Amino acid sequence: MANLAVKVADLEAACDWYASAGATVTEPVAWENGRRADVMLGALQITLFTKAIYEDATTLPDEGFLHPALFVDDLDAELARHEKVLWGPRVVSGSFGTRRIAFVDAPGGMRLEFMEQIEDPN
């Protein structure tokens, strides 16, 4: 697993809260259609988003758990196992390098993000 994604209404307040809990928190940055920051809390990485990249494809609450992000070796093979892809695949780049990503709906009213690493970070 790469990280857990959480949507927050107030990114700065969420970053401050995690920092006061002892986490290492990156500075918020612009990301796709919103902003994001990464939180390292022990072995757990949480990515805080103000807007999910797939928000136009599904109904989401203003705040809450979005999805776990999972690495796969072959995104196309993974997606072939699912009846419907909610969003993607699409190539994204950032401090994490370059990845192909896609999202599927999963039982329990949640989504899964599958990520294939194309280029490692510089």
Predicted features along the sequence, with ranges:
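Vicinal oxygen chelate
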Residues: 28, 38, 83-122
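Residue-level marker for the onset of beta-strands and adjacent loop->beta junctions
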Residues: 2, 33-35, 66, 100
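Mid-chain, well-packed structural core segment of small domains
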Residues: 61-87
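Short, charge-rich, low-complexity interaction segments located
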Residues: 56-58
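Core segments of cupin and vicinal oxygen chelate
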Residues: 6-46, 78
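N-terminal beta-strand motif that seeds the catalytic metal site of vicinal oxygen chelate
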Residues: 1-13, 65-68, 118-122
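Short, charged/polar, Gly/Pro-enriched secondary-structure boundary elements
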Residues: 43-47, 109-112
